[in-house]
Amino acid sequence: MAALIPGHPTPIAPNAWRVLGRNPGMMTGPGTNSYLVGDRALTVIDPGPVDHEHTQALLHAAEKIGRPIEQILVTHTHRDHSPGARELAEASAARLLGPDVPDDGLQDETWAPERRLRHGERVDCGGTELEVIATPGHVGNHLCYLMVDQNLLFTGD
């Protein structure tokens, strides 16, 4: 397995890359995992916390891969997974898709998806398909995404 270097895209499967966030800690391990998925265009899963350098790393990764970022999905709205979505969307003109924000005061209240995703739905990610799987438990709005052609599950936490 390749070394995890924050900000650098690491291939994990055909049409899937991981970019490690720069927020190591007790709750995040080496940092939040952000993913870029797609064949003709990219979907970012979990853009991470507000961190301009991480946003730039995701944009540079897309440039290196040679595909535009068209969508941003989050697995849940904890502050280490979704707050970076707004800056990334503004920089890439990507659409925001994912869960609603629970009204418990513990979530990223800046998250506002253009489209709410539901269990069983399928999302086209530039020629690669993700199936939405509702997995409440860690937090009530938690979603996982199954990359159907690779049988690869993006779980968030």
Task: Please place each PLM-identified region on the residue numbering.
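Ser/Thr-glycine-rich phosphate-binding loops at phosphate-binding pockets of nucleotides
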Residues: 47, 73-76, 135, 139, ...
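Conserved beta-strand hairpin/beta-sheet module of binuclear metal-dependent hydrolase folds
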Residues: 7-65, 144-155
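Active-site HxH/HxHxD metal-binding segment of metal-dependent hydrolases
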Residues: 30, 49-131, 151
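Residues at the C-termini of beta-strands that transition into short coil/loop
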Residues: 20-22, 100, 136
